[in-house]
Amino acid sequence: MAEDTAETTPGVPERGRRRRKTAAEPAAPACAMSIHAHPDDQEFTVGGTLAKWARSGCRVITVCITSGGAGSNQSTPLDMTREALVPIREEEQRRACQALGISDVVFLGYEDGVLEPFIALRRDLTRIIRRYKPDAVVCGDPKVRFYGKGYMNHPDHRVAADVALDAVFPSAETRLIFPELLAEGLDPHHVKRVFIHGAPRPDAFVDISSTLDAKLAALREHKSQMGQWDPADMITAWAREQGKSRGLAAAEAYRLMVLEGP
């Protein structure tokens, strides 16, 4: 149900203010699947939402398409290898999920940094969706290449989002796409809602005021990526900016797709 709120223009009497409709926060799903390219992608973008849903009783499944083996930065030892980094990043992701209240974590094992929209990847994501049967899927926006003037969206992020959406529709709900999955006992599944973060014109907002601390705690578990940097100031500023249009102190914003049934 929409909430009717008044514009708070200083000096304008309440009866003279323009009124606008503010959509209510989307209800938490019973089961949600978060699909991203790397360990820490989820925590940067949607960690507050997932923590809030988990606290409400939602089962959340985290899917990392890669294990972040290319995630090096200035604090990474020069002798670090992909093979050594992968178990570190997987353990960091598990600890981050614990901070958010998530117990189901799946790593698909694709190579970090060179992700391509292979049919094998779509099949793997379709398999995971059919196995867990989420009511909602959370992913990025595959069309976003730039954020402002200072950040280029990682190509792995775009591929992960693109293939996740293709797995949701048509693959997960269409019986004769990947018929080999039927032999595994994985029948078609219809995902009811898709929450797309990073979209240019979001239309759904989740108040994360109560879970911002959990989001920050989860991010801090990614020690191999954070180094000595504390993300609190940046993440808090992002949450404040996303909530501003809805009068929220902290929010995560989405384009919400409500998908018609097959």
Protein language model features and the residues they cover:
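Active-site rim/loop-helix segments in enzyme catalytic domains that contact anionic ligands
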Residues: 2-133, 255
